[in-house]
């Protein structure tokens, strides 16, 4: 029997990516598509690549429209998911691709988002220690942010194996789709092409507390994070370069062994052969993650680099993967697409 899925926020990048993946899922029937500001328009006018759904008309996001579905994907701006979710029954699997339910500490939410904390849901990054167990049978899932996905997968093996001191320095470049679909002057082609620029510098980026939360859980102690995001002249993808001071006695061999153990059975995370480095082009449009790690003996630092597609593994692919686990379906179902090259 097909799993009936609704997507709220179908006109945006995250909602569109979710639909692209859901179309390839053999157990899914796509139900209601909503988009408040675009209600009444055909999806094809807003997401012309979704040809099988082009004639579907967007509806307003309301409990009546979303009723009668097994799963509801929420692709809404932060602060809007909670109001919709509380109107959906406890038997509906709600997968929130926004930020509302990711953080455990209410003070972190209020500091970085400036509104009351809505609560915390099981976290949709199965590769983290205990991640799959938290998702199995769950009816509520908080999909991680794109940067925290890339950073957490790059660094958690070092912290879980007690190889790194509890402080990390991260510089990550992201494609422009990470900023959403709304028109913004700094995202105009003439502003972005041929240029890279940092933003959210000095610990103010909203994904910072999520990284601290994940790495601290892996380490078993608080981890400080210095995070500098950079806007790259590409539509999608994240390349995260993460460094942490190594503990005494660490060797290149012990670092490599920790990463091999962490990712040995992971279907989507690929620890590359030594000497090969992650590239966003290699994971474009896929749920794959490329990871490489090195040990700088002179500086006594562990360097871990990851590449993801921010819209796929970083958002909608991670959502679909988590949905599969929650429903007891094979984890890779609907996610067999590999990267596009060149």
UniProtKB/Swiss-Prot annotation:
EC numbers: 1.2.1.38
SUPFAM superfamilies hit by this protein: Glyceraldehyde-3-phosphate dehydrogenase-like, C-terminal domain (SSF55347), NAD(P)-binding Rossmann-fold domains (SSF51735)
Reaction it catalyzes: N-acetyl-L-glutamate 5-semialdehyde + phosphate + NADP(+) = N-acetyl-L-glutamyl 5-phosphate + NADPH + H(+)
InterPro entries in the record: AGPR_AS, AGPR_type-1, NAD(P)-bd_dom_sf, NAGSA_dehydrogenase, Semialdehyde_DH_NAD-bd
GO cellular component: cytoplasm
Coiled-coil stretches: none
Gene3D superfamilies xref list: Dihydrodipicolinate Reductase, domain 2, NAD(P)-binding Rossmann-like Domain
Entries under SMART domains matching the protein: Semialdhyde_dh
Record localization: Cytoplasm
Class of this enzyme: oxidoreductase
Catalytic-site annotation from UniProt: 146
A GO molecular-function descriptor: NAD binding
Record pathway: Amino-acid biosynthesis; L-arginine biosynthesis; N(2)-acetyl-L-ornithine from L-glutamate: step 3/4
Keywords attached to this entry: Amino-acid biosynthesis, Arginine biosynthesis, Cytoplasm, NADP, Oxidoreductase
Gene Ontology BP, a term: L-arginine biosynthetic process
One Pfam assignment: Semialdhyde_dhC_1
Family: Belongs to the NAGSA dehydrogenase family. Type 1 subfamily.
Function according to Swiss-Prot or TrEMBL: Catalyzes the NADPH-dependent reduction of N-acetyl-5-glutamyl phosphate to yield N-acetyl-L-glutamate 5-semialdehyde.
Protein name as it appears in the record: N-acetyl-gamma-glutamyl-phosphate reductase
Species whose genome carries this gene: Streptomyces avermitilis (strain ATCC 31267 / DSM 46492 / JCM 5070 / NBRC 14893 / NCIMB 12804 / NRRL 8165 / MA-4680)
Lineage: Bacteria, Bacillati, Actinomycetota, Actinomycetes, Kitasatosporales
